[in-house]
């Protein structure tokens, strides 16, 4: 039984989407509601991560200084050096402690991501691998039914079921042999029967040969004919029920990519990518990641990171619904970072901040050409 991302998607994410769609029939609002619910549920974990990052950003200079002193002091005694370093980590905290909340969040966030990349928001792909043998070897082929892993498909609003692609005679064919790829539920109900029960749903499967185009022929109904020996891969796609539905300024929740092959620009997707980059930059500023400590190279890296990360969506496009989720999630995290950055620091951390501020003021008061120690008075 699957208790991973698929379990979370089917038993947590999709029921939430179905509930909100039943209240307000808008898949766009359902995405917004689902994103906010998951983000609020993960708030304590992400808050712990943000607090730890804020703390480590403050204590890191002092911690590094102490570590360097220990390495120099006990360079001839590795055991004592290790012991003292562990004491420093106990005093200031382990820098890796903030990774645990992130690791705990990852399965939930990946399940949310996977949910928005599947039905009903996007087309679901099935990969059928075939082996074609010469016709004289047909006696060696043992018929054995072939089925792809089942995937969740929305047949109608609020109604979804597991659907698999099958080849009753198996995926090993002889040249000249004909067969048909069929979709059906786990209970064996044919996909056309499901569609007949919901005539309002226009879900016409599509077929594409991704490997071995010269070895096989396939029509719109999934009928195939083996032409030449070799390996073949056919990709079947069941369209997403809500893929062509819009929300606010978004034309289609399932649209993938900011630019079509005919060079048509989709400004709704471009706008979300730009806004995501801006929110990422603001989040970096609030979390202090843009404080490079006077290192110009690191400062440059921090500034261009949001540009690079956002620009990736132009080359590795995602469905508009997934982009909307990422924008909402990032804005939520930015607001959370802002709120937590206004929290009072623990007393011991506040003392470190005050000490650092005093040192900074003292360094500013000392001019570069002045000696750090007072000059001895000369007697004439």
UniProtKB/Swiss-Prot annotation:
GO cellular component: a single term: plasma membrane
What compartments host this protein? Cell inner membrane
Q: Name one GO biological process term.
A: protein insertion into membrane
Which positions, given as ranges, span the membrane? Answer: 12-32, 96-116, 265-285, 308-328
Q: Which UniProt keywords apply?
A: Cell inner membrane, Cell membrane, Chaperone, Membrane, Protein transport, Transmembrane, Transmembrane helix, Transport
Disordered: annotated segments:
361-380
Query: What functional role does this protein have?
Result: Required for the insertion and/or proper folding and/or complex formation of integral membrane proteins into the membrane. Involved in integration of membrane proteins that insert both dependently and independently of the Sec translocase complex, as well as at least some lipoproteins. Aids folding of multispanning membrane proteins.
Family membership noted in the UniProt record: Belongs to the OXA1/ALB3/YidC family. Type 1 subfamily.
Name assigned to this protein: Membrane protein insertase YidC
Organism annotation: Nostoc sp. (strain PCC 7120 / SAG 25.82 / UTEX 2576)
């Amino acid at each position: 039984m699957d208790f991973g991302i698929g379990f979370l998607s089917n038993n947590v994410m999709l029921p939430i989407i179905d509930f909100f769609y039943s209240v307000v029939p808008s898949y766009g609002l359902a995405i917004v509601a689902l994103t906010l619910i998951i983000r609020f549920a993960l708030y304590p974990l992400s808050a712990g991560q943000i607090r730890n990052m804020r703390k480590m950003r403050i204590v890191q200079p002092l911690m590094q200084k102490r570590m360097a002193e220990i390495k120099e002091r006990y360079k001839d005694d590795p055991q004592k050096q290790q012991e003292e370093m562990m004491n420093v980590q106990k005093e200031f905290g382990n820098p890796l402690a903030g990774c645990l909340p992130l690791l705990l969040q990852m399965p939930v966030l990946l399940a949310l991501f996977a949910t928005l990349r599947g039905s009903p928001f996007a087309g679901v792909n099935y990969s059928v691998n075939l082996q074609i043998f010469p016709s004289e070897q047909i006696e060696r082929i043992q018929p054995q039914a072939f089925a792809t892993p089942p995937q969740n498909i929305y047949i109608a609003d609020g109604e979804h079921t597991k659907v698999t692609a099958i080849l009753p005679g198996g995926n090993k064919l002889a040249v000249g042999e004909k067969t048909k790829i069929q979709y059906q539920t786990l209970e064996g109900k044919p996909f056309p029967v499901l569609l007949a029960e919901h005539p309002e749903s226009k879900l016409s499967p599509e077929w594409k040969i991704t490997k071995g185009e010269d070895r096989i022929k396939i029509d719109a109904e999934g009928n195939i004919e083996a032409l030449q020996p070799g390996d073949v891969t056919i990709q079947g796609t069941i369209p997403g029920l809500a893929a062509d539905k819009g929300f606010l300024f978004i034309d289609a929740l399932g649209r993938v990519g900011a630019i079509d092959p005919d060079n048509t620009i989709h400004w709704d997707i471009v706008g979300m990518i730009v806004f995501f980059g801006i929110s990422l930059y603001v989040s970096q500023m609030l979390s202090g990641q843009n404080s490079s400590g006077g290192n110009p190279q690191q400062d440059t890296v921090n500034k261009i990171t949001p540009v690079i990360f956002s620009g990736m969506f132009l080359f590795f496009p995602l469905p508009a619904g997934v982009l909307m989720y990422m924008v909402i999630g990032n804005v939520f995290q930015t607001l959370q970072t802002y709120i937590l950055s206004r929290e009072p620091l623990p007393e011991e951390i506040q003392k470190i901040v005050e000490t650092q501020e005093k040192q900074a003021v003292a360094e500013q008061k000392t001019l570069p050409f002045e000696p750090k120690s007072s000059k001895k008075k000369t007697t004439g």
